[in-house]
Curated annotation (Swiss-Prot):
The gene is csrA. HAMAP family: CsrA. Keywords: Activator, Cytoplasm, Repressor, RNA-binding, Translation regulation. This is Translational regulator CsrA. The lineage of its organism: Bacteria, Pseudomonadati, Pseudomonadota, Gammaproteobacteria, Moraxellales. A key translational regulator that binds mRNA to regulate translation initiation and/or mRNA stability. Mediates global changes in gene expression, shifting from rapid growth to stress survival by linking envelope stress, the stringent response and the catabolite repression systems. Usually binds in the 5'-UTR; binding at or near the Shine-Dalgarno sequence prevents ribosome-binding, repressing translation, binding elsewhere in the 5'-UTR can activate translation and/or stabilize the mRNA. Its function is antagonized by small RNA(s). GO terms for molecular function: mRNA 5'-UTR binding. Belongs to the CsrA/RsmA family.
Length: 70
C-alpha cells in the first residue's frame, strides 16, 4: 500500500485521468473529491462490496433458472 500525505486543497493523481483532491478535514473524517472519466466507476468500499454481492447473486440466480428450464 502506498501511503501519501496531503493537505486540504492538494491533489494526487492515479494514472493520467483520475485525480483525488482533499477538500476538508473535520475530526476523524476527510472529505475528498474524485475526478474520473465516466467509464471509471468510483464507489465507497461498502457500496462496491454491495454491488459485487448483487452481481454474484444475479449470476447464481441465472444459473438456477437455466438449470430448471432444461
Amino acid at each position: 500500500m502506498l501511503i501519501l500525505t496531503r493537505r486540504v486543497g492538494e491533489t494526487l493523481m492515479i494514472g493520467d485521468q483520475v485525480s483525488v483532491t482533499v477538500l476538508g478535514v473535520k475530526g476523524n473524517q476527510v472529505r475528498i473529491g474524485v475526478n474520473a472519466p465516466k467509464e471509471v466507476s468510483v464507489h465507497r468500499e461498502e457500496i462496491y462490496q454491495r454491488i459485487q454481492h448483487e452481481r454474484a447473486m444475479h449470476v447464481i440466480l441465472a444459473k438456477i433458472m437455466d438449470s430448471t428450464s432444461l
